[in-house]
Amino acid sequence: MALCLFTAVTLAQDKPYPIFTLDHLDAAMKTLGPNVAGIRASLDDGDFATAKARVIRSREQLAVTVTFWRDRGRDDAVTLLRTALDRMDALDAALSIETIDPRAVDTLATRIGGACDACHTIYREQDPVTSEYRLRQSALQ
């Protein structure tokens, strides 16, 4: 019995840490974008419950991307990511109170967009042929 337990523990230790690839990042960003846009649309419609649900989902989608940036030693990207997550948390909190202040949540949503834009300015570029966005090659070095 002890031998089986030792073998299981040893095998578990040998299992490599999951890798968050460029394809994973691309997929996360492509699903995150519409959710973030949906936050703004829901706020504009005064649909705070849907906006809150989109904030929660957006945060989940964005948070996992930290592995990509950490694995590449991009501390500035991790800082930008944490800023965006903190702003999403603030918007979630503002949407969780009984009487929601539309101006406050609008300001917080704008601040989330600013955090996204700050990272995208550094790490994203538009393909001149397809017009699709992609990660700058410098982010991979």
Where are the predicted features?
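Signal peptide processing junction and immediate N-terminal pro/mature segment
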Residues: 10-12
